[in-house]
Amino acid sequence: MQHGMKTTPFDRIELDDDTRKHFLRTMMRIREFENRLAESYLRGMTAGSMFHLSVGEEAAAVGMGSAMRNGDYFTTHHRGHGIFIARGADLGRMFAEVFGRIDGYCKGKGGSMHIADINLGHMGANAIVGANIPISLGGGFSMKYQKKAAISVAFFGDGALNQGVLYESMNMAALWKLPVIFAVVNNQYGMGTRIDHASASLKFAERAETFGVRGVEVDGMDVEAVWKASHELFEAARRGDGPGLIVANAYRFYGHGRKDPSPYRNKEEEEMWRLRDPIDTYRTRLVETKVISENYFDQLGKTVKEEIDNAVEYASTCLAPEDEELYTDVYASEGK
């Protein structure tokens, strides 16, 4: 059951006005979800002590997520709410999960950093930096083995770009020509370390060339630019042309976690990036090109807020798991 506006996995390949409205609506849903999650955390409504928000990165999540198709697999890192919503997640069940309730996607056991739903192709979020990447490799191997015209996408941040497992996985994906996409959201910081203090070279897309893998870099604050680059790369992998790497350069408006006040960033930098807010700039573009009106945007904002209100209310009424749930979903059932 959906709790609010009906959402199904986006599965279109035309960049028309309906698609543009979908981009805007989905970015707004992600933003409102995460802002409400931050508020719920401060009110003590959530289970768990750490949340990693992707406010500011919505264009990257929606652009890449909307280039996927039904039947594709994906994994995410610890900052993965946006991509899951972009793939059609039920917001009521998402809130229930982070509130630690039985009706959450993982019965309240996974929380923010370990949410999953195989029905939507989500093989799981992962709190260990880079650990989700080889899991997506397995998904890609499965697709090729079964001769499916589908892809497997590993979403991760710039903090994983220096993890050895990424390059082991990239080598294997290239060697076996697997339909795997390595999708990076570069938000400029790994926790509190600026990216140029952690990487000797910032030409991340070029790293893929060592393995004969196509690599592209894109403005991660421009949803259409992200979608176009992703669509081309994803469809090539779907055709059997092998893996690809996409790097979407963006910025997180919050700190690493909700408790982080970002003392390592200066106000000028933050203000510069906020002027490129992906929702504000896209709204302006769509109004100027007459795809939407200001009234349309205002009404959409009210609709999204109402949807989030309903989702939070639903999650708040869900029950906590019984003690016996500690012993379920631990081992595979016999014969499976």
Predicted features along the sequence, with ranges:
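Conserved acidic/glycine
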Residues: 1-60, 248, 258-336
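Generic preference for hydrophobic/aromatic residues in regular secondary structure cores
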Residues: 7, 113-114, 213, 217, ...
